[in-house]
């Protein structure tokens, strides 16, 4: 699997482009690249990739980002019933609209791509995906405790119900949620 990823990465076409940027931005980018132990070119490619693949869609769609601490506080202020209702409400509307906006179709692949992108970009947790035959499995590890798992379970169930019109099989622990669909 790793050699396949390397071959795909090496087969991507690249192009050369030149930009003029403010010196303070250059210093900031060089510092960040050094801290991440990557080249300035790699960092720039990541920034451009994030913009093209995600940020422009998030902005056009009106997404609002929230810190992990604020999200944790929100969850802690709600009882279990309200957490489930909140998660189902947002999980059954915005994801479907966003997926259609970005990918133009509702398919297991576009749903999986959305979940991975959304969870990792929005800070809900680290996401691992597998697909065997016709079953996709999404595992999310997070830092929000039991109330976070309750929210994420209801959120993921609502996404699958509203997009694929089927039930997902969801398992949860205090800091992880696994969904099969």
Descriptions of predicted regions:
Residues 38-61:
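Short, basic amphipathic alpha-helical segments that act as recognition/interaction helices
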Residues 1-23, 34:
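Short Lys/Arg-rich basic patches
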Residues 172-181:
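C-terminal edge-of-domain segments
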Residues 9, 23-46:
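Surface-exposed, Lys/Arg-rich phosphate-binding patches that contact polyanionic backbones
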Residues 119-173:
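Short, hydrophobic/π-rich interface segment
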Residues 69-137:
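An N-terminal amphipathic alpha-helical segment
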Residues 26, 45, 49, 53, ...:
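Amphipathic alpha-helical core segments of compact helical bundles
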């Amino acid at each position: 699997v790793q050699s396949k990823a390397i071959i795909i990465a090496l087969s991507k076409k690249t192009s050369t482009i030149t930009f003029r940027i403010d010196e303070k931005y250059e210093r900031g980018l060089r510092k960040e690249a050094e801290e991440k132990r990557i080249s300035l070119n790699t960092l720039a490619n990541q920034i451009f990739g994030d913009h093209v693949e995600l940020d422009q869609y998030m902005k056009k769609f009106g997404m609002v980002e929230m810190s992990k601490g604020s999200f944790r506080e929100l969850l802690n202020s709600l009882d279990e019933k309200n957490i489930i209702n909140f998660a189902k409400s947002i999980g059954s509307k915005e994801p479907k609209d966003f997926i259609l906006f970005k990918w133009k179709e509702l398919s297991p692949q576009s749903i999986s791509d959305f979940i991975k992108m959304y969870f990792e970009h929005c800070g809900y947790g680290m996401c691992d995906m597998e697909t065997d035959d016709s079953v996709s499995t999404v595992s999310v590890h997070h830092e929000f405790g039991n109330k976070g798992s309750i929210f994420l379970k209801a959120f993921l169930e609502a996404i699958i119900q509203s997009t694929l019109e089927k039930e997902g099989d969801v398992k949860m622990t205090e800091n992880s949620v696994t969904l099969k669909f």
